[in-house]
Amino acid sequence: MKLLEDKILKEGILLEGNILKVDSFLNHQMDVKLFNEIGKEFKRRFEGCNINKILTIEASGIGIATIVSQYFDFCPVVFAKKVDAANMDKDTYESKVHSFTKNKTYNVRVSKKYINKGDKILLIDDFLANGCAALGLIDIIKQGGAELAGVGIAIEKGFQKGRKELEKVGAKVESLAILDKIENDKVYFK
């Protein structure tokens, strides 16, 4: 998606360890106009998949998933929680997820009330690196007896193993901007 690639080139900041900082428009301050175009593009790519629910993980995927929902008849958006909360149901589906950026493992949870047999779920997230978050969410979908319709990613680090890991479990992966490499303080797209 050229619009997203242009935004990355213009506003993205490269940090040590191949970390692309896009907090000015994607995962801290949100460019809602861009998100709207992202929603339209995911609708185009997942047209006909009969999606009735969107699943993401807190926190950075929530904004994108909410906008994407508009293009799938305002279907519910569910997000997996990384932290225990007093108001969280005790009856949950759980999976372990390792964060590439934070180098930390989380036990993510979704209430059993929100993932059901017969659901056709689209996973949405801001980044795909090693695939750990998406694999954890796919595990939760399976625990609930629901069906994975596909995985929609804003930015994929194509030089990491995430896509291969997701394709191994049969996931349809659609990424809007695929980084081919980060070299000499420059981003290259596939």
Swiss-Prot record:
Q: What's its top-level EC category?
A: transferase
Q: What is its EC number?
A: 2.4.2.22
Annotated compartments: Cytoplasm
Keyword Glycosyltransferase, does the record have it? yes
Q: In which pathway does it act?
A: Purine metabolism; XMP biosynthesis via salvage pathway; XMP from xanthine: step 1/1
What is this organism's lineage? Bacteria, Bacillati, Bacillota, Clostridia, Eubacteriales
Q: Which domain of life is it from?
A: Bacteria
What does the record give under GO molecular function? xanthine phosphoribosyltransferase activity
Which residues, if any, are the signal sequence? none
Q: Which UniProt keywords apply?
A: Cytoplasm, Glycosyltransferase, Purine salvage, Transferase
GO cellular component labels: cytoplasm
Q: Which reaction does it catalyse?
A: XMP + diphosphate = xanthine + 5-phospho-alpha-D-ribose 1-diphosphate
Which residues are listed for 5-phospho-alpha-D-ribose 1-diphosphate binding in this entry?
A129, N130, G131, C132, A133
Name of this protein: Xanthine phosphoribosyltransferase 2
Q: Give the principal location in a single coarse category.
A: cytoplasm
Q: Give the family this protein belongs to, as stated in its UniProt record.
A: Belongs to the purine/pyrimidine phosphoribosyltransferase family. Xpt subfamily.
